Amino acid sequence: LPSWTKVGVATVGKCKGTLEAMKAADIVLPFHVPLFTGWLKECMDAGTRFLMVIDGPEDLEQLASPRGLKHAMKYAEGRYKATREVRVTSDAGTDLTYACGEYPVMTQWGFADEPGHFDHWGGGHIHTFPDEGSANGTVVFQPGDIVILPYCRYVQDEVWLEVRDGFISQVDGGLDAKLMRDWLDDCKLSEGDQDPYAVSHLGWGMDPQAAWHYLGLNGDDPERNRAATRVFPGNFLFSTGPNTQGGGKRNTKGHYDVPMRDCSVMLDNEVIIDAGRLVDDDMIVPREPR
């Protein structure tokens, strides 16, 4: 199986008869990351449900979908589908806008109970891919934001990104900026390949069972952080690279996932997240003690 950082690798889809078997199945439980693969889309289009299980046993218990999460996620899905422009700001200097509607909204609530639905045990996250060329502005990673892919670490120093027409045109900062540039450059297929620097899926987390501090509590083992870091309520997840999962044409391994704290998110000028706190009551789900 491919490592955590190798997204879009064909894996089991290459095995004779496997694709046909999965397309005929009701549900498949992958224990690796099948996202951005062609075979996954084929199976989902055929109606197969997928529940990805890639986190540690303690986290599977803690992050299991609480009562009301699916209802809140479906509400958020409706809001995001109706949105045409998103603006993301922060006191750290982020001011990013993008248009949406060209690609589907993808929603996870922690279980796969609908035909053709993909989910992640521990999920509670929503995202879409921005319309081609529409993302523009500045994104600032601040200390405490999380690089969960390809690394598994809190950001230590500010990283300033300039985004122009859907691509990151400049990366400034110290160690964290160097780590980002080196990874994305290493994923280029040629000198002129800019796909790793494209803006990929953008969205936010809503699972009250997750918390920002879990990475500090559990250490930098990806198995303990794959879901929790992406789904804690009010984070804005910025990413780079592929968009094939949404039906786009960018197929690159240069994927970078950064759940950001303290951002404000506006859907068509209406605030749903204020400085990292969900303020739309219909997106807020009570935490269950476990």
Regions found by a protein language model. Give the residues of each.
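Active-site bordering "gate/hinge" segments
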Residues: L1-Q156, R164, N269-A275, D280-R290
